[in-house]
């Protein structure tokens, strides 16, 4: 019996604050944050992410965010590209429609965590998934929540996944 093909799975991590969170968070929040994280999953030679337009893909590092600030090796998967794209299509029609996006509760990191677990059985690092609750646990975070809840983030430069001809 031939061993299954294994495909590497990477987590691309971007600091949307470009270092400002590290400098300003102690003053504004009373606690140190290392960054404001956007994440995506790289598998089968493409980068996949979730934003206010739904699930998108691009060549790795191909959004206007440029190259990631760090790359986490999530592991390997036996899931073929065909099965993975079917899975993404079903997610895009259910849990990860664009209108389901919420900066604190259902965001790019929620998507990356879900997909990482599907592909490898492993979660993404907790310093990323815990960030919203860390911010909201501060008085400043609570005061900003109504404004921040209205923010929709969609990194430019990706192609829609699971919609015919890239339609939204």
From Swiss-Prot:
Keywords per UniProt? Cytoplasm, Hydrolase, Nucleus, Protease
Subcellular location, in the record's words?
Cytoplasm; Nucleus
Instruction: List the Pfam families.
Output: Peptidase_C97 (PF05903)
GO biological process assignments: protein desumoylation; protein export from nucleus; proteolysis; regulation of proteasomal ubiquitin-dependent protein catabolic process
What InterPro entries does the annotation carry? Answer: PPPDE_dom, PPPDE_sf
GO cellular component annotations, sorted alphabetically? cytosol; nucleus; protein-containing complex
Task: State where it is primarily located.
Answer: cytoplasm
Looking at its record, which EC class is this enzyme?
hydrolase
Which intervals of this chain are the motif Nuclear export signal 1? Answer: 83-91
Motif Nuclear export signal 2, chain ranges: 139-153
EC number annotated for this UniProt entry: 3.4.-.-, 3.1.2.22
> Which reaction(s) are listed as its catalytic activity?
S-hexadecanoyl-L-cysteinyl-[protein] + H2O = L-cysteinyl-[protein] + hexadecanoate + H(+)
Give every PPPDE domain span.
7-149
- Taxonomically, the superkingdom here is Eukaryota
GO terms (molecular function) for this protein are: deSUMOylase activity; identical protein binding; importin-alpha family protein binding; long-chain fatty acyl-CoA hydrolase activity; palmitoyl-(protein) hydrolase activity
Keyword Protease found: yes
The active site lies at 38, 108
* Similarity comment: family membership: Belongs to the DeSI family.
Query: What role does it play?
Result: Protease which deconjugates SUMO1, SUMO2 and SUMO3 from some substrate proteins. Has isopeptidase but not SUMO-processing activity. Desumoylates ZBTB46. Collaborates with UBQLN4 in the export of ubiquitinated proteins from the nucleus to the cytoplasm. Exhibits palmitoyl protein thioesterase (S-depalmitoylation) activity towards synthetic substrates 4-methylumbelliferyl-6-S-palmitoyl-beta-D-glucopyranoside and S-depalmitoylation probe 5 (DPP-5).
Describe the subunit structure. Answer: Homodimer. Interacts with UBQLN4; leading to the export of UBQLN4 from the nucleus.
What's the protein here called?
Desumoylating isopeptidase 1
* Source organism of the structure: Mus musculus
